[in-house]
Each structure stands twice: as C-alpha cells, then as structure tokens.
C-alpha cells in the first residue's frame, strides 16, 4: 500500500569510492527499507563535491523540481491517468546535506542543516536556533521541514559515541556476549544492525556491568520510534503520540547530558528537530536511509564491473 499522498524520498550517499543518488517510495509493508525498493538513478566514481554532485544529478533533480513545482504527479490508474498529490523528502547524512542544499558544513559553528544554532550553545544545553533560510541557487526546492533526520546515522552515531568512551575491556566482553564484532573502520565501532543488537542486549540483560546503562536504555527506547514495525504499535493511540515522543526525547537528552557525554551534532537533531519531523510526517524510520546504505556493497561490485579497478576519480555518471 502506497502512502497517501504519494511520498517520494530522495537519498544520496558515498560508499567506498562511489557516490550514489536515487529514490524510493515508502510503502506500508514489511521490509519497506529493503534495497530492492530503492531506485538507483545516478552513480559516479569520485568524492562528494558540490560540482560533481550537480553534474551527476542535474537531470534527476530537474525532474524532481518539476514535481515539486506542480505539487502532483501523473500516474496510470486503471484505464486512464490521474494526478496524485505528491510530497518529496530528502534523507542523507550530515556530510551530504551541505552539498545538496548549500547549508553550512557539519564542522561549522552553525552546523545544523535546519537551524542556525551556535555550536557553543548546543554544547551547554538542549536548544535550537533561528530557522535556516536556503540561499539561491539550490539544487532541490525541498522545504527544510521535509529533510529527514537520518534515523540510521543518528542511532548508530549516538551508540558509537557512548561506546567510544566506555571501558574497553567491558566493551570487548559485551561484544563477545552479543556475538558481534567491532567494525574495521576506525570512525565507527558498530554498524547500524550490530548497534541495535547491542542496545537490545543491554536492555534485556540488566545484570550485566555496562557503562552508561541508563543512557543506552533511553537510546534504545528512542530507537523504537525509528523501527517501521514498532512505530505502528507506538502510535496506535494517536492523541498521546506528541507527549510520549517528547517525553522519550527529553529523558534521553537529560540522561546524555547528565553523563557529560559529548554534545555531538546528531544529539542536536534529536533534541531540537526530531519530534517536529515525526509529528509532521507521521513517521521516521520509514523515510530512512537504510536502502541506499544496503546498496553500497552492490555498488562496489557494480563500480568494478562498469569502471574497472584502480580508475582515477574522474566523473563517470550512469
């Protein structure tokens, strides 16, 4: 079942040496975040830069902008056609958004893609800043309210930040108990799937000695809102959703800050913008970036087949 109005989610990400762009249509079915539901429309071998991304996505984004301008999309229905009201969203990590929307880089003082909060203010307490205005020209005419707080990167990033400052020996023993291994990448201890397994283990095994247990438990509770299946259960009583959601976010935020953990960018998205997004769009994980992330492995194989091994990072768009 396609959500009504028709919703199209665009996404872009770099995996290995290949940058990919595409879209998917969220559907009310199990495994809606499967990579088989993701339509890969543009791929090039090379880094994430504004110039390369604009070249690689020019035709793709022009088509999307025409939908945004019209507000609907003509679709075949039965023996004829019908114009369907259409909403377009974009999901990407905090490194991709500046290249697509021209916002400040995630390492800037005004690091948030959605507001102009100052980094020092965010470090002191949960807060937000004036709503950001996108400067012309921009590649996509998507309103800021339709930029997804990326669920996979947020939950994974917050989990890994806690693990980074946890006792190494305890962490090693816990990984053994959960039957997971640390990622080979220095920038990320656990992948999204293993990170979720770890959070579940912490919650279901209260007898284990775990650093930052309360915060990890609160993070697990937050992660349930990112699960497509769990979200349906959590929102059966629709009237209570805003209060319960805000309560979960506030409890997690307070625990994180009480533990004096680093106030990273992803924490700000949760504290200042996540509740508004979920309430406005009636969902979170269903708009997530899992599909394109799962394509990275296939993309690496495709890159080798299309471009050959050891190619220079010249723009090659398919």
Model-derived features: positions:
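A structural signal for the principal folded core domain
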Residues: 1-318
């Amino acid at each position: 079942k396609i959500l009504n109005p028709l919703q199209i989610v665009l996404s872009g990400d770099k995996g290995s040496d290949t940058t990919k762009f595409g879209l998917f249509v969220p559907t009310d079915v199990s495994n809606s975040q499967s990579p088989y539901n993701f339509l890969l429309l543009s791929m090039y071998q090379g880094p994430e830069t504004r110039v390369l991304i604009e070249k690689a996505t020019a035709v793709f984004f022009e088509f999307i902008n025409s939908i945004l301008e019209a507000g609907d999309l003509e679709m075949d229905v039965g023996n004829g056609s019908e114009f369907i009201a259409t909403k377009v969203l974009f999901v990407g990590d905090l490194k991709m958004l500046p290249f697509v929307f021209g916002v400040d880089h995630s390492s800037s003082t005004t690091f948030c893609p959605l507001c102009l909060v100052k980094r020092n203010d965010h470090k002191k307490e949960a807060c937000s800043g004036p709503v950001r205005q996108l400067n012309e020209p921009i590649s996509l005419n998507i309103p800021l309210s339709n930029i997804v707080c990326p669920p996979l990167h947020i939950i994974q990033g917050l989990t890994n930040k806690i693990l980074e400052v946890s006792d190494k020996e305890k962490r090693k023993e816990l990984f053994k108990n959960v039957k997971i291994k640390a990622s080979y990448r220095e920038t990320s201890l656990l992948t999204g799937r293993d990170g979720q397994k770890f959070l579940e283990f912490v919650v279901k095994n209260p007898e284990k000695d775990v650093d930052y247990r309360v915060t990890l438990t609160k993070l697990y509770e937050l992660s349930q809102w990112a699960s497509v299946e769990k979200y349906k259960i959590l929102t059966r009583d629709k009237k209570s959703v805003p209060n319960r959601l805000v309560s979960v976010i506030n409890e997690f935020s307070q625990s994180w800050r009480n533990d004096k953990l680093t106030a990273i960018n992803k924490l700000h998205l949760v504290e200042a913008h996540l509740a508004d997004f979920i309430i406005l769009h009636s969902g979170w994980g269903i708009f997530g970036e899992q599909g394109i992330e799962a394509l990275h492995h296939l993309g690496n194989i495709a890159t080798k087949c299309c471009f050959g091994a050891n190619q220079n990072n010249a723009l090659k768009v398919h």
